[in-house]
Amino acid sequence: MSGHSKWATTKHKKAVIDARRAKSFAKLIKNIEVAAKIGGADLSGNPTLVDAVQKAKKTSVPNDNIDRAIKRGAGLTGESIDYTTIMYEGYGPGGVALLIECLTENKNRAAAEVRTAMTRNGGTMADPGSVAYNFHRKGVIVVPHADGVDEDAVLVAVLEAGAEEVTDLGESFEVLTEATDLVAARTALQAAGIDYDSADAEFVATVTVQTDAEAARKVFRLIDALEDSDDVQNVYTTLDLSAEVQAQLDDE
């Protein structure tokens, strides 16, 4: 259950990306709007909305912004929320596969921005289905390190709720579940009094690619360029960092 998870290391620069607060806030608000539109404004009956709100609060999105997003999404303000999810596939430097998740009200703009970011940063677009098979949909819960919360405590809390793996990432624990077990595992953590930062359904690579430090830098630059687009919600990759490459990047 526990131990090193290769795919987890690919997210070591996530904190740097999330530091772009304005972009991050806008994307978190969009998630709340969509969750409220699909499941309604009542948090007690909409677990997806609960997780979207939790993630926004942990990223310091103001409560007023969150409340307005819920009302907009649920249609309580008279505004129209019409986002479409689009998945793009491609390859980055070093043969790293990319799955690019967009949430947009303008498909043409999203396609153009993704293609431009890929072309300018060493990436190439791929045919639908040619990359996606390298990923499985999984539930991913991030639990911050805290007093009295160690890997065993997290494991005990989520084991009966369908958790597959608990990994210590240094500053947090990551819980991996089937996507269908995400809410159950998150609820089990809450019942055990363990706080969590985020609980999301994500695409996790089943096949990984190791590169040298230079190629890894190029991949991260490509991810940065893609996530600069307001329409790009998430970028998933098959990149796996060896301990040596990880150390080189951390020293920069």
UniProtKB/Swiss-Prot annotation:
GO cellular component: cytosol
UniProt xrefs under InterPro entries: Integrase-like_N, TACO1_YebC-like_2nd/3rd_dom, TACO1_YebC_N, Transcrip_reg_TACO1-like, Transcrip_reg_TACO1-like_dom3, YebC-like
UniProt xrefs under SUPFAM superfamilies: YebC-like
Residues of the signal peptide: none
Gene3D superfamilies tied to this protein: 1.10.10.200, 3.30.70.980
Top-level division of the source organism's lineage: Bacteria
Alphabetical keyword list: Cytoplasm, DNA-binding, Transcription, Transcription regulation
UniProt subcellular location: Cytoplasm
GO biological-process terms attached to the record: regulation of DNA-templated transcription
Main location: cytoplasm
GO terms assigned for molecular function: DNA binding
Recorded family membership: Belongs to the TACO1 family.
Xref: HAMAP family: Transcrip_reg_TACO1
PANTHER family given in the database record: TRANSCRIPTIONAL REGULATORY PROTEIN YEBC-RELATED, TRANSLATIONAL ACTIVATOR OF CYTOCHROME C OXIDASE 1
Protein name per Swiss-Prot or TrEMBL: Probable transcriptional regulatory protein Lxx10750
Species: Leifsonia xyli subsp. xyli (strain CTCB07)
